[in-house]
Amino acid sequence: MSDSKPVEGAVVPVEQRDLQLMLESGYLYLELQKPTDSQEIFSGVEALLPKSEVPQLALNHLHFAKGEFPKALAAAKKAVEMNPGSAAAHAAVGEALLFLKRIPEARESLKRAISLEPDSPAAEFAKALEEAIEVGVFA
């Protein structure tokens, strides 16, 4: 008997465990320097969950790793549109904006991430990016 639950909002029935495995596979391919395979997996998850920010954040990470900062920003912004309450999505927007040298906009997104979930890993990441701004990393 499976202890995994079906994922709500999926276009076809898929269990949480299977979705997690797909995402982990996509990240593994990314680590193995196989971005095409990673993109195929993340795009497949996006097709399964068209209303979830999770695949958008995965695509953000993929584009970011490839140095495609405008595409990373677009995916992160789409994640925010899908879930405005996601600190991770706001932090991802802030990070992409920093690498595009759009510091004032980045600060706004980072502050939003921190205010949404102050004790979360996303907020900690946003705080670290704010510190990097302060010491001139993105100048």
For each feature predicted by the language model, list its residue ranges.
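TPR/TPR-like (Sel1-like) alpha-helical repeat modules
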Residues: 98-121, 127-134
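Start-of-helix register in tetratricopeptide repeats
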Residues: 20, 54, 88, 121-125
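Mid-chain, well-packed structural core segment of small domains
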Residues: 69-104
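Alpha-helical adaptor scaffolds
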Residues: 19-83
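TPR-adjacent "capping" and linker segments in tetratricopeptide-repeat scaffold/adaptor proteins
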Residues: 3-20
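Structural signature of alpha-solenoid helical repeat scaffolds
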Residues: 13-14, 47, 81, 118-121
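Register position in tetratricopeptide repeats
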Residues: 31, 65-66, 99, 132-136
